[in-house]
Amino acid sequence: MGKIIFVSGIDTDIGKTIATGFYAKRLMQQGFSVITQKMIQTGCQHISADIIKHRQLQGIELTAEDLNGITCPYLFRYPCSPHLAAEMENNPILPSKIAQASALLAQKYDYVLLEGAGGLAVPYNSQQTTLDYIVEQQLPLILVTSAKLGSINHTLLSLIVCQQHKIEMEAVIYNTYPLEDEKIAKSTQLYLQQYIKQHFPNTEFLVMDRQ
């Protein structure tokens, strides 16, 4: 059975999709078989746009699991929060369906990288959030952060919440693209590296530039 790792971010549009493909490619270069999965995709039809991007970054074609929907169990047309998109299409999101899809993939691949939608507190129904899913499934986490002003606050809040919920931190990926202010980016990187080294000594810190 392969290892399932959740990928989330400190905010929406933080670079999770690129980071997921980046990390998948990195594992592939180490000799592992890797598949990515999208928990929920909104603003899309037919095949998840994020899955397509993952495959481009991995340098592979779409898989059979992509074409039959296993790598993205929930696909909604309207570009909004998952809970609203599901409500609009009268298609409630069931965590069991996502978990079953991940388990199927884990039977075939060494690693399954499961990318979430938005940040940790994004709701996928009226009662449950992404964080709830990670905790319930006991999944290790890759957290994607950025060099933008304000990201230290968002990153630390996310890490503190994960610590409180005893979530295993697999890695933190520091996305430097787009580089808006080099001085802020370097200072933020140094601060986060030191913080993670002190509070999460077993967590890998990776820097990702434009892919």
Curated annotation (Swiss-Prot):
The residues that the entry says bind ATP are: 13-18, 50, 115-118, 175-176
**Primary location group:** cytoplasm
Q: Which GO terms describe its biological process?
A: biotin biosynthetic process
Q: Which SUPFAM superfamilies match?
A: P-loop containing nucleoside triphosphate hydrolases
Question: Which enzyme class?
Answer: ligase
Record has Methyltransferase as a keyword? no
InterPro entries (alphabetical): DTB_synth_BioD (IPR004472), P-loop_NTPase (IPR027417)
Q: What is this protein called?
A: ATP-dependent dethiobiotin synthetase BioD 2
Biological source species: Haemophilus ducreyi (strain 35000HP / ATCC 700724)
Phylogenetic placement of the source organism: Bacteria, Pseudomonadati, Pseudomonadota, Gammaproteobacteria, Pasteurellales
